[in-house]
Amino acid sequence: MSFPDFSASDAQIQWQRFCDLLWYHDDLGLWLDVSRMHLNASELEALQPAMDRAFTAMHELEAGAIANPDEERQVGHYWLRNPQLAPSDDLRTHIAREVDDIEAFGRGVVHGEIKAPSGVPFTDVLWIGIGGSGLGPALMIRALKNNNQGLPFHFLDNVDPNGMSNVLGGLAGRFKTTLVVTVSKSGGTPEPHIGMEQARLKLEAAGGKWAGQAVAITMLNSRLDQQAQQEAWLKRFDMFDWVGGRTSITSAVGLLPGALIGCDIRDFLAGAAQMDEATRVADSRRNPAALMAASWYVAGEGKGRRDMVVLPYRDRLEVFSRYLQQLVMESLGKRLDRDGNVVHQGIAVYGNKGSTDQHAYVQQLRDGVDNFFATFIEELEDSEDIPVIKNERPGDFLDGFLQGTRSALTEGGRQNMTITMRCFDERRLGALVALFERAVGLYGELVNVNAYHQPGVEAGKKAAAAILDLQQRVEEVLQDGVPRTVSEIRQVLDDGSDESIFWIMRHLTGNKRQYNAQGDWSSPAGMRFSKD
């Protein structure tokens, strides 16, 4: 397992290290270079027993073991791109049939064979989903959609009233030909439900027919699935209970957007499957996900002490850093390890795209606090329809900027790795996603956290529900029109906190809800609130 240690000052030693550590997949045309991370041979060797256990755990996960004990669930996103891995014949058949259905439906919509109830082809897609149900589709569209290819996409991925107004307002005049896709695993998540109700109101007011334009992606027999069945929606697709939102991009959640813009979704799945195969190799030096996970571990001392800065040098991948934020941070950001010890694990992720970032925060990366490692992503193949003007090729400049930033960071002792793709298409996107999925899974095993649950998210949902319940009771107290301070409101309720009630009243009075505020906003304890 010998290779030279990192050397910023000796180019020949560093070249040898580059050659020794470079990983390449010929069919995918994909390279991984971790030579500028500070991982050394003795550290990789010391990690090997833990990595062997991680390989075993990943093998058991793929074979159908309960990998999420909190919810007694299997974790099967790897089965989606290789149904033969699924633990039963019924499941293998179901997964394969689902891909066939998605492909056929997408083709029918794109080619105008599946029409809106008005009898004309669909013109737009309104996609309603939160978290992975929004980020995965957004990545698919931004990364793979070409001009005039498939249908335009519009996203409701939040409950911001202004954002919803802008998106829905932009569909004015086309609601009758808009395909509306609602994604909710349980069918009970508030954000997609609220977005769906707002979209339905606008669509029906414009003369559209909801059932003939609505598609659901949800678990079988969920609240949303039952509604879609009862109302005879246009189409329903499965969101399996063994697929988490952050790893759902190779399910209907990611495949349907791809199909609706005319992508080859089977190539996307094939790329993910190829990378899955490459990352099953039980030799860290020949396994790109293991090299990444080991590099992350050593860089952050096994405690997540360095952030991951994602720098893709392609506009198509500008959403990728946000996609990785959820994949990495929701998977690894845990208070407890599997043994119940308080560990506060995690890796913070941020980024945008090159070379834009060189004119933004790269200044700090080069000269500021050394608390990160960078991940460069590049594509070699340039678009042929951008001409050479005055002997200037945009792609040459982009490559020069990437190499220059990489060199500047390395000279400053800042760790970085680079993923290079010969070209970028559905297959490479699938491979890229699968590479990070496996690296996250292996790293989770190295630090002994459950990478497949999200108790913090659930805690946030419960806290939000409590606030909404408190708001309802605050409004009931104020029905009598008597002005009260927040403390007096709390005393009537015998519940809540003054600060929470103040936040609620500030929100209510900031909108046309017939609530009044008297007093000085800079002295909240003395403010009095009432209803007309």
Curated annotation (Swiss-Prot):
Function (record text): Catalyzes the reversible isomerization of glucose-6-phosphate to fructose-6-phosphate.
Catalytic residues, chain numbering: 330, 359, 461
EC number: 5.3.1.9
Name of the protein: Glucose-6-phosphate isomerase
Main location: cytoplasm
UniProt pathway annotation: Carbohydrate biosynthesis; gluconeogenesis; Carbohydrate degradation; glycolysis; D-glyceraldehyde 3-phosphate and glycerone phosphate from D-glucose: step 2/4
Alphabetic keyword roster: Cytoplasm, Gluconeogenesis, Glycolysis, Isomerase
Entry's Gene Ontology BP terms: gluconeogenesis; glucose 6-phosphate metabolic process; glycolytic process
GO molecular-function term, one example from the UniProt record: glucose-6-phosphate isomerase activity
Organism listed in the record: Synechococcus sp. (strain CC9902)
Classification via Gene3D superfamilies: Glucose-6-phosphate isomerase like protein, domain 1 (3.40.50.10490)
Annotated catalysed reactions: alpha-D-glucose 6-phosphate = beta-D-fructose 6-phosphate
InterPro entries: G6P_Isomerase, Phosphoglucose_isomerase_CS, SIS_dom_sf, SIS_PGI_1, SIS_PGI_2
UniProt feature coiled coil, ranges: none
Similarity annotation: Belongs to the GPI family.
GO-annotated cellular components: cytosol
Signal peptide positions (record): none
Transmembrane feature ranges: none
Pfam families given in the database record: PGI
Keyword presence, Cytoplasm: yes
Subcellular location: Cytoplasm
